Each structure stands twice: as structure tokens, then as C-alpha cells.
Design a protein with these regions (language model features):
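Bacterial N-terminal signal peptides that target proteins for export
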Residues: 1-8
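An extracellular/secretory-lumen and virion-surface interaction module
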Residues: 20-159
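Repetitive helical segments and hydrophobic/amphipathic motifs
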Residues: 11-12, 70
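C-terminal motif of bacterial Sec signal peptides marking the signal peptidase cleavage site
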Residues: 15-18
């Protein structure tokens, strides 16, 4: 009898490992993303990025003890026009607010991050997040992002 719970646990672990740990990976959508990277320390990253079917994860609500709750989603495979770099990342924003808390952007092997993502706004009505001249850094290297990243409409309440 003791083998049954052990077998069930092993089966569950195998299934979760097979599907990436049970997380919500980005799936292609019919939502448009369009942004530009400017003033990059690595000038090969500068340019227009966009996708007509941006891969997005679902929006997750993160309940935090002693701090304002957050909403978070990921995006991936947003190519630069003309080839080269491909963008992916994570957007975190405060619940019941248009305030972006953090943007993490991965480009050409570098991870650029902003806490207090500059001039940015979450628009629940338009299902997107807009950035206007937001500076992100990877230590000393920096990039500036201006444009829009979509988010799914089937979000948890307050997100």
C-alpha cells in the first residue's frame, strides 16, 4: 500500500517536468506588439521590434505579504525588423493600478531591467502596456524602449 502514494508522486513529478514544471509558457496570440529600442550601449540592438501574433503567457496575480500585490506576464519571440535580435521578457505591474513596477527585457543574451519602468502605463481597457522612453539597464549597458506590449484580456480580477 505504501508504494501507491510513492508511485503517484513520481508520476506527478514526471508529468510536471514534461510540461516545463507546470508554469504558464507564452503561447502565440493574434495580438500586436510594436516598440523601438534606441540609445542602446550595444548599437546593434537599436531598431524597431514587432510581431502580429505576440506569444504571451497568461497574467498571474502575485499576492505578496506586507507589500502591494502584483500582476505579471511574460512575452517572447518579438523580432527586430530586418533580423538580428529577438526580444522576450516579463512585465510586472501593481494590482488596481496603471503603474508598471518592473520590466525585464532579454535581448541578444543580455538581460535589461528597470524597476520603476520610467514613463509607462498599463491600459486594461486596451489590453496593453505602453512604454515611453523607459531606460533599462544590464549593469552598465543600457537600452531605451518606446512602444507597446499587449497583454491577454482573460486576466485575474484587479489585473
Amino acid at each position: 500500500m505504501k508504494k501507491l502514494p510513492l508511485l503517484a508522486s513520481a508520476l506527478l513529478v514526471s508529468l510536471l517536468a514534461a510540461c516545463g514544471g507546470g508554469g504558464d509558457d507564452p503561447d502565440p496570440t493574434n495580438l500586436n506588439s510594436a516598440f523601438t529600442i534606441t540609445s542602446a550601449t550595444d548599437t546593434t540592438l537599436n531598431g524597431a521590434y514587432g510581431s502580429a501574433n505576440t506569444p504571451l503567457s497568461g497574467v498571474n496575480k502575485l499576492e505578496r505579504v506586507g507589500a502591494t500585490d502584483l500582476c505579471s506576464f511574460t512575452f517572447e519571440n518579438i523580432p527586430r525588423a530586418g533580423g538580428g535580435a529577438v526580444a522576450e521578457g516579463t512585465v510586472e505591474y501593481l494590482v488596481d493600478s496603471s503603474t508598471v513596477r518592473r520590466l525585464v527585457l532579454k535581448l541578444a543574451g543580455g538581460t535589461y531591467e528597470s524597476t520603476g519602468a520610467g514613463v509607462s502605463a498599463v491600459s486594461r481597457a486596451n489590453n496593453n502596456v505602453t512604454f515611453t522612453g523607459s531606460v533599462l539597464s544590464a549593469g552598465t549597458p543600457t537600452v531605451t524602449i518606446t512602444g507597446t506590449i499587449p497583454m491577454r484580456s482573460d486576466r485575474p480580477s484587479s489585473c
